[in-house]
Curated annotation (Swiss-Prot):
The lineage of its organism: Bacteria, Pseudomonadati, Campylobacterota, Epsilonproteobacteria, Campylobacterales. This is Uncharacterized metallophosphoesterase jhp_0380. Its cofactor is a divalent metal cation. Belongs to the metallophosphoesterase superfamily. It comes from Helicobacter pylori (strain J99 / ATCC 700824) (Campylobacter pylori J99). It is an enzyme of class 3 (hydrolase).
Length: 370
């Protein structure tokens, strides 16, 4: 609760700052001033509603109120930029007529930049995810292994059965050895999305489909979600490990649940039955789960999602601070690598900026082929 309140206070501070910065440079009539004030009040009210009632509100309100935090951050970034330019113009020794002309130019530029930002953001957000191929070289691997990593599909009120069907069709074209679903598959009460998820039974691969939950599964009821997913043609790796395709494939529950009594991540338990002669792949929703690794764990590759590659720049800079790894393949330490997918779907409004969605196609190759 304290974290939620702190998060809300930060958002309200951003809203207040944006309000003050823009107000000092925008010329508003009386009616416009009330509308301007009302916009920021509604924005803060939406954020408060989301923070305190997100687990019980209807899906359409969840999407609407969650989007308010994105709007606050974007408004703050643009307001700060506009304020900085306008303040500089005021301080430079221009002729009054030139200063006025430059301020008008900046104002028009601000509106055009804002329009272009949202146009590009919605274009990327609504675009269907494309397959992105990445080669990864591993020690102790005998032969090539082809993997599809699906994360952050966020199946719910906006991303429904047609979206899942598209994903399945794209995946099946690659004829891979296994399909891994790295969490945040469900973003709605499971009773409302069961039919949307049924096409996942049509995923084709040599060894099958494997899944770990993300934080959004906990938001919407982890037990009923896992109960339903157990009826589908997939294996849930909840702190468990399987041996197939010449690797140890291990999975853990999400980092979000680390303080829970049940469905909490336990890396030691997940690795208990692995074969040390084979490379070990750990499927964990959040990249920062890697901070829990010890040298003795000897993980070769961690596969994660959660970040959406930041979803909207420059929000991605804050995500990187929180998660360390944002998107793509990284060398963590020693022999441990981590791949973070940008995700196939989106959270909140369909907006992505400089963070396109993806279906990650990972070609695991013996290191001697590098």
């Amino acid at each position: 609760m304290l974290i939620s309140i702190a998060f809300l206070l930060v958002l309200c501070l951003l809203n207040y700052s944006s309000f003050r910065m823009l107000k000092s440079f925008l010329t508003l009539k009386k009616i416009s001033r009330y509308a301007y004030l009302g916009f920021f009040i509604l924005l803060s009210a939406g954020e408060a509603t989301f923070v305190f009632y997100r687990n019980v509100m209807p899906s359409h309100l969840f999407v609407l109120t969650s989007a308010c935090s994105f709007v606050s951050f974007i408004a703050f970034v643009f307001s700060l930029s506009f304020y900085g330019f306008s303040y500089s113009v005021e301080k430079i020794d221009f002729l009054p007529s030139r200063r006025k002309g430059l301020k008008n130019f900046l104002r028009i530029g601000f509106y055009l930049a804002l329009l272009g930002y949202f146009w590009r953001g919605f274009y990327e957000g609504l675009a269907r995810p494309k397959i992105k191929e990445t080669p990864i070289y591993l020690d102790k691997l005998d032969k090539e292994l082809k993997i599809i990593l699906l994360t952050d599909m966020h199946v719910g009120s906006l991303l429904q059965k047609d979206f899942v069907n598209y994903i399945v069709e794209e995946v099946n074209q690659k004829e891979v050895d296994m399909v891994l679903i790295g969490g945040d598959l469900v973003d709605e009460n499971i009773e409302k999305v069961k039919s949307f998820l049924l096409p996942l039974n049509n995923l084709k691969s040599t060894h099958g489909t494997f899944y770990v939950p993300g934080n959004h599964e906990y938001y919407h009821g982890i037990e009923p979600i896992l109960s339903f997913l157990n009826t589908l043609d997939m294996t849930i790796l909840g702190n468990e490990c399987v041996h197939l395709g010449g690797i140890n494939l291990c999975g853990v529950y999400d980092y979000f649940a680390r303080k829970r009594q049940d469905f909490a991540p336990d890396i030691d338990k997940a690795l208990k039955k692995r074969d040390s002669s084979k490379p070990t792949i750990l499927l964990a929703h959040q990249p920062k789960q890697i901070r829990s690794l010890k040298e003795s764990h000897s993980i070769d590759l961690v596969l994660s999602g959660h970040t959406h590659a930041g979803q909207i720049f420059p929000f991605s800079l804050l995500v990187k601070l929180a998660q360390t790894y944002l998107h793509g393949l990284y060398k963590h330490s020693g022999t441990t690598q981590i791949y973070v997918s940008s995700g196939a779907g989106y959270w909140g409004i369909p907006l992505r900026f400089l963070a396109p969605s993806e279906i990650a196609y990972l070609r695991l190759l013996p290191k001697n082929q590098a």
